[in-house]
Regions:
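N-terminal targeting signals for export/organelle localization
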Residues: 2-50, 208-209
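Short loop/turn microsegments at loop-to-beta-strand junctions
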Residues: 46-47, 69, 170-172
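A short beta-strand-turn-helix
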Residues: 49-68, 93
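Short active-site neighborhood of thiol/selenol oxidoreductases, capturing the structured segment around
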Residues: 61-89
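Conserved helix-turn-beta segment immediately C-terminal to the redox Cys motif
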Residues: 67, 85-107, 124-127
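Thiol-based oxidoreductase modules, predominantly thioredoxin-like and allied folds used
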Residues: 101-114, 131-141
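Short, internal strand/loop/helix patches
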Residues: 120-170
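Thiol-/selenol-based redox modules, centered on thioredoxin-like
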Residues: 159-209
Length: 209
């Protein structure tokens, strides 16, 4: 009987040691890889769209594929939250400038004023690299629909009046992966904790293969 107890203890110790070794093996195998990290959740999908960029060139949902994009909505004459939002966006752009497949896609929420020419002037004044920080204009209803139903940056319930009477003003950013999936969460472009979280999620999505 005493011998059985000793054997059971040895067996238990062997099992514990084996379990620890297996856990350790997989930790070192996947440590630092995308498999070990938690992935930002899929919360929506980019829908088909067709807008014009600051150079008058067509930009569609296909231009999002193969890129990791941060999306925002702003307008060039904004004196309130937009300057701070775009200042924070500039910081994000600088941090990921070395990633060739990273881009910022900024839509106007005031297309009646923000023509292609005005977006170009704004880009020049901000010294934006428009190869990877794209400014878009288009039909107001299409822009607002993308913000609300694809990127989740504004409440669809706000779509209650005629489009001419609506004016969307949102401080939130969205993260889109290479396959057109909206990832992570809706990030507040004015709050540092959200910006820090966004930067971490950008890196996680960039690391995905």
């Amino acid at each position: 009987l005493q011998g059985n107890k000793i054997m059971n203890k040895k067996t238990l110790l062997y099992l514990i040691s084996f379990t620890v070794l297996v856990i350790g093996f997989y930790y070192f195998l996947f440590r630092g890889t995308d498999n070990w990290k938690s992935k930002p959740a899929i919360i929506s999908y980019v829908k088909p769209f067709r807008f014009l960029n600051q150079d008058g060139q067509v930009f569609t949902d296909s231009n999002m594929l193969g890129k990791v994009s941060v999306v925002e909505f702003f307008f060039t004459t904004c004196k309130g939250i937009c300057p701070k939002m775009n200042g924070n966006m500039a910081s994000i752009f600088k941090e990921f400038a070395a990633a060739p497949d990273f881009q910022i896609v900024a839509h106007t929420c005031d297309p009646d004023r923000d023509s292609v020419a005005r977006l170009k002037v704004y880009a020049d004044s901000m010294k934006i690299d428009t190869r990877r920080w794209i400014l878009l204009t288009g039909r107001k209803d299409s822009l607002y629909q993308m913000a609300r139903t694809a990127y989740l940056l504004d409440d669809p319930k706000n779509n209650v009046a005629s489009i001419e009477d609506q004016f969307m003003h949102t401080q939130f950013f969205a993260l889109v992966d290479r396959k057109g999936k909206v990832r992570g969460q809706v990030y507040d472009g004015l709050k540092q904790p959200d910006l820090d979280r966004l930067k971490k999620d950008i890196q996680r999505v960039l690391d995905e293969k």
